[in-house]
Amino acid sequence: MTRTKVAIIGSGNIGTDLMIKVLRTSKHLEMGAMVGIDPASDGLARAGRFGVPTTAEGVEGLVALPGFDDIEIVFDATSAGAHVVNAARLLPLGKRLIDLTPAALGPFTIPAVNLEDHLEAPNLNMVTCGGQATIPIVAAISRVVPVEYAEIVASIASRSAGPGTRANIDEFTETTSSAIVEVGGATRGKAIIILNPAEPPLIMRDTVFALVTAADPDVHEQIRASVDKMVADVAAYVPGYRLKQAVQVTEIPADQPVHTLLAPDAERPTHQVSVFLEVEGAAHYLPAYAGNLDIMTSAALQVAERIAAGKADR
């Protein structure tokens, strides 16, 4: 079987973890290039030891590589600003882009929710690590009952956040909030990220709060079942993804001012759904606490595998 050649731009934590996943676990992909801007980066050094072609000259260095024409898919693991430049250079050359930054030039893509809708898109955006972990849960609740407001809190180990992640903090909240609405189906959404400085580093933890109208106990059970199914769907490509405890559906007290979170014309919801998750990494590059890397790179790999498999089927 002929494998699809891919390149990764960004030799930091995310790009390096993704490279190792492609090399060790991919069924349909082959590393064609690892691209960075720091000649001394660990990611480029590792790529060189693995025999992967490398360049420290950024996107122009990629285009200049002898094997560039054979590369079909390019993962961008840089920053939101850099992705704008990279996309402008690569899309006219016919490369498919999988964007692991919050730039969101292409459609938001969550494999367990809407991958099949975007397989032909030239540039797919992977939202954010927090989005990959929590938006499937919002979507699962939305499949049962309308979600007037959804709020997610992503807590990641500070040590797992490299310079690219830190540079994108504002874009993280904006992009994730938008995707909660666009992909998750909530009327309104908010995202909060916490870089936890605790030592030893703690595993990625995510919390989803959703405000719904669901007075019927049978609906509560439908919500729990939908969330359980979605967790299993995500865990199929992120094995360390799991519920921390049972889904909670609680009545909203009459004196709680939830109207401040809702659209002006929204009816007051009756219940809050609370979902608590944790994501343990596969430790391909960083230790297992870096589940935020693992869910992002695993989701991106799932997208590329599906694109490559679809090409092979045609």
UniProtKB/Swiss-Prot annotation:
Keywords: Aromatic hydrocarbons catabolism, NAD, Oxidoreductase. Gene3D superfamilies: Dihydrodipicolinate Reductase, domain 2, NAD(P)-binding Rossmann-like Domain. Belongs to the acetaldehyde dehydrogenase family. The active site is at 129 (acyl-thioester intermediate). SMART domains: Semialdhyde_dh. Its EC number is 1.2.1.10. Signal peptide: none annotated. Coiled coil: none annotated. One of its GO terms (molecular function) is NAD binding. NAD(+) binds at residues 11-14, 160-168, 292. GO terms for biological process: catabolic process. This is Acetaldehyde dehydrogenase 1. It catalyses: acetaldehyde + NAD(+) + CoA = acetyl-CoA + NADH + H(+). InterPro entries: Acetaldehyde_dehydrogenase, Acetylaldehyde_DH_C, NAD(P)-bd_dom_sf, Semialdehyde_DH_NAD-bd.
